[in-house]
């Protein structure tokens, strides 16, 4: 005789409130409102093959960390009354094995004997967190079933949900956008849709915060829809991305990911996706669909080999510049299984590493995958910061926030860059959870203290990690400040934490190796902080040849130098050039006085360069450091925001005709102070040196912000070229109108098809009347080249840019100069598909700039 199973109807609370009830035990409405659900059953009962008694579940009755339960990826039977997790009613005992169904889709999962152990404490944070996003205009007794958060039944069904089932609705339908509003996903010739190319970044300004004003919620939903479409594809993840980048010299720093670690990442990612969708459900109001197992996406991560390739890309484009990977972080499997790591925070950390590697990959599919992962991790990280989980280490949270901000600022997605810019100050405060300073001799004293060797090593690693994180935040903050022209969040006077130690000591694999290297490193390298190091530099105590500073120390010295230049540049925008009547003559704060201080800072930059050139180092980190030096030197002599504003305005509608003496009209018109009159040649030399270093950097080792440097140098070089050769940079429309006006004023008629602009003596360039100057190549020689020194000191020669094939481009050739920088963004010699999203955005910005000035050339891709 088959037992009877009661048919549940609306519970008591939903019935009294006259609200819709999903008729689960407990129902989603009671769980979201933290109520004790009282289910009711109909008089008639239905027959079911299996039936067990289900107890009433109170919302606070959740298992703790010590009651960890094993979640199997295979089929599960209903649990007894002592368990909290309840199986879904759609699971049938005669259904095929879930693991076999998942294998049919191409995803690899572990067998039943290899189980994924997940802590169930943080899984239930998804349930009450949605109440924070409840609209204020919804009464408590009103039906909120369409906005309800997932209950424990759904979480249990989510882990073992078969990937071959019908996934139902997409993300756009889920958040209330019809299918007709979804943009076409047909790729263009470079793998991206036309609408995506036109809406990724602000026109002519890649991601600059001062141009953001519109709402990006629709772009966020579109990105999440594409992410779900990517992870829901039935075909397996192709290895084209790994095969394309397999030939690149990625160092094998991190150990390969095992299938067990991948399965743990799948489970964590699935729950993060559920959490993100539940939050977006609350934010999109009553038009959204109810969250149910029918419209949930089953996340399918790339294979382990592809994940290994993405982690190698992460080490190339990020970690080799900051050195945050210790011996334990070099193994991604230990990150997930480390007893001191919270599972959710460890999963977010590893997923962000993978997402940064995917951002550096030129495949459009990888970019969509990285943006979706970034949004999921951002939502989860906000919850960790608000809840302040006691078991989560502050350095893990700070590490996750650093990776998230770095990924968001250089992702190329406008909505993500806008959110990250808004959260930049909030994430920076994570560093203040731990004290910023400690005794610099503490590590040396611990060697002779009462702790054993293992405790000494563990104590030193915690302090070293905090030190490296602090200074990594400083370096990334300087990169954001330099590229986006925003103030820095750090000052040198607060940097009292000891500088990082040597890489050999940091990468020690065992406590024995660390103990053998520690006395030597602590004895030869005096522990100091950045504030003391900068004081020694300002006092001229660091001289070339006396002592060789590590590369990381020289990189950190650029942070306060950039801060002084930026601060003085802000002052120059506030003080007028003309004298003010009410000011006293002896007042120190004036425009000339600030220029004098800026000259003093400029005198410090060559001293830093003398220290840097004594390093026998050709690593990508050294090349990146020299690029930062030249950018700071350019900021000291040029105002990039004014240059950018002048170029974005485009040429003037009406230009003043040249006078008989031969002075050419400037197509920029009258603009604010941009470049000092006596620094134009020196600025061109710095631009050429950056272009030379850009060519030396291998494509696999380029940081994510590398193309932003090309954009910055392109605008400065174009501006100086216009100032140097204003006649050649006049658009053809302006030249034609000026010729007609000149001919009509002289009483002659001109044929529109036979007008030769260069034959008019009024438009003959003044350089042509002078003796021929020898070309000075800017981007092919070292800075100590004699021709560059003569050009800087005596202004002799005509600056040129050298192309890869040996041809020279003069700055008086607008189309060739524009084409040179457009091709340089993605390498020029590489196919168009080998451009990341940020590189393609910068390239689009330069193309629009060339089109606005009338010098856009069609390129073969």
Curated annotation (Swiss-Prot):
Gene behind the chain: opdJ
Protein name: Transcription factor opdJ
Presence of the UniProt keyword DNA-binding in the record: yes
Deleted gene: phenotype: Impairs the production of oxopyrrolidines A and B.
Main localization of the protein described in the UniProt heading: nucleus
Entry GO MF terms: DNA binding; DNA-binding transcription factor activity, RNA polymerase II-specific; zinc ion binding
Pfam families tied to this protein: Fungal_trans (PF04082), Zn_clus (PF00172)
GO terms of biological process kind: DNA-templated transcription
Source organism per UniProt: Penicillium oxalicum (strain 114-2 / CGMCC 5302)
């Amino acid at each position: 005789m088959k037992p009877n199973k009661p048919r549940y109807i609306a519970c008591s609370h939903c019935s009294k409130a006259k609200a819709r009830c999903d008729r689960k035990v407990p129902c989603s409405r009671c769980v979201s409102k933290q109520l004790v659900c009282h289910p009711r059953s109909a008089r008639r009962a239905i027959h079911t093959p299996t039936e067990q008694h289900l107890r009433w579940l109170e919302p606070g009755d959740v298992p703790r960390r010590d009651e960890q339960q094993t979640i199997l990826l295979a089929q599960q039977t209903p649990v007894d009354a002592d368990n909290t997790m309840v199986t879904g009613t759609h699971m049938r005992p005669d259904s095929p094995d879930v693991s076999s169904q998942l294998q049919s889709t191409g995803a690899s999962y572990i067998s039943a004997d290899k189980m994924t152990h997940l802590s169930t404490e943080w899984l239930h944070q998804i349930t009450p967190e949605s109440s924070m996003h409840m609209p204020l205009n919804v009464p408590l007794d009103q039906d909120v079933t369409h906005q309800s958060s997932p209950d424990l039944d759904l979480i249990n069904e989510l882990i073992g949900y078969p990937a071959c089932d019908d996934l139902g609705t997409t993300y756009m339908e889920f958040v209330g956008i019809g299918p007709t509003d979804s943009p076409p996903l047909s790729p263009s010739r470079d793998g991206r849709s036309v609408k995506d190319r036109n809406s990724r970044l602000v026109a002519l300004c890649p991601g600059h915060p001062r141009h953001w004003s519109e709402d990006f919620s629709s772009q966020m939903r579109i990105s999440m829809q594409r992410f779900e479409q990517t992870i829901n594809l039935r075909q397996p993840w192709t290895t084209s991305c790994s095969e394309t980048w397999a030939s690149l010299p990625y160092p094998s720093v991190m150990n390969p990911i095992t299938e067990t670690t991948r399965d743990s990442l799948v489970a964590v990612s699935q729950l993060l996706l559920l959490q993100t969708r539940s939050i977006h459900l609350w934010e999109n109001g009553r038009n959204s669909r109810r969250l149910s197992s029918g419209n949930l996406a089953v996340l399918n991560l790339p294979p382990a080999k592809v994940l290994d390739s993405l982690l190698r890309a992460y080490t190339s484009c990020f970690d080799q510049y900051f050195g945050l990977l210790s011996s334990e972080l070099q193994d991604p499997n230990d990150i997930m299984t480390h007893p001191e790591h919270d599972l959710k925070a460890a999963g977010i950390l590893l997923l962000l590493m993978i997402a940064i590697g995917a951002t550096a990959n030129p495949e459009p599919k990888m970019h969509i995958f990285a943006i979706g992962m970034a949004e999921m991790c951002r939502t989860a990280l906000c919850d960790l910061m608000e809840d302040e989980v006691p078991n989560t280490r502050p350095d893990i949270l700070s590490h996750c926030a650093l990776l998230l901000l770095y990924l968001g600022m250089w992702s190329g997605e406008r909505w993500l860059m806008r959110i990250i810019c808004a959260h930049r100050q909030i994430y920076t405060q994570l560093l203040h959870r731990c004290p910023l300073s400690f005794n610099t001799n503490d590590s040396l004293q611990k060697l002779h203290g009462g702790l054993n060797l293992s405790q000494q090593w563990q104590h030193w690693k915690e302090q070293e990690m905090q030190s490296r994180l602090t200074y990594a935040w400083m370096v990334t903050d300087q990169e954001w400040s330099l590229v986006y022209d925003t103030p820095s969040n750090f000052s040198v006077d607060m940097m009292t934490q000891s500088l990082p130690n040597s890489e050999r000591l940091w990468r020690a694999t065992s406590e024995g190796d660390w103990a053998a290297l520690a006395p030597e490193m602590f004895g030869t390298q005096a522990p100091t902080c950045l504030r003391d190091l900068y004081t020694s530099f300002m006092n001229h105590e660091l001289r070339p040849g006396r002592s060789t500073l590590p590369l990381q120390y020289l990189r950190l010295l650029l942070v306060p130098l950039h801060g002084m230049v930026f601060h003085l540049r802000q002052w120059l925008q506030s003080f007028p050039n003309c004298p003010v009547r009410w000011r006293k003559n002896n007042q120190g704060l004036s425009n000339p006085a600030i220029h004098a201080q800026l000259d003093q800072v400029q005198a410090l930059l060559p001293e830093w360069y003398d220290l840097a050139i004594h390093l026998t180092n050709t690593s990508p980190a050294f090349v990146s450091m020299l690029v930062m030096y030249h950018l700071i030197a350019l900021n000291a002599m040029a105002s990039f925001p004014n240059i950018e504003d002048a170029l974005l305005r485009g040429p003037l509608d009406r230009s003043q005709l040249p006078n008989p003496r031969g002075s050419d009209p400037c197509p920029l018109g009258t603009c604010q102070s941009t470049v000092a009159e006596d620094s134009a040649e020196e600025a061109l030399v710095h631009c050429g040196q950056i272009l030379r270093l850009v060519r030396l950097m291998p494509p696999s080792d380029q940081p994510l912000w590398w193309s932003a440097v090309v954009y910055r140098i392109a605008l400065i070089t174009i501006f100086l070229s216009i100032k140097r050769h204003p006649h050649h940079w006049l658009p053809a429309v302006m030249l034609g109108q000026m010729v007609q006006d000149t001919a009509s004023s002289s009483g002659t008629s001109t044929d529109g098809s036979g007008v030769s602009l260069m034959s008019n003596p009024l438009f003959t360039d003044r350089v042509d009347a002078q003796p021929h100057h020898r070309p000075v190549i800017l981007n092919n020689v070292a800075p100590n080249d004699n021709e560059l020194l003569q050009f800087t000191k005596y202004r002799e020669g005509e600056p040129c840019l050298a192309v890869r094939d040996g041809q020279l481009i003069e700055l008086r050739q607008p189309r060739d100069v524009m084409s040179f920088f457009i091709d340089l963004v993605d390498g020029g010699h590489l196919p168009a598909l080998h451009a990341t999203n940020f590189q393609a955005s910068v390239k689009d910005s330069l193309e629009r700039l060339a089109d606005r000035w009338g010098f856009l050339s069609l390129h073969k891709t």
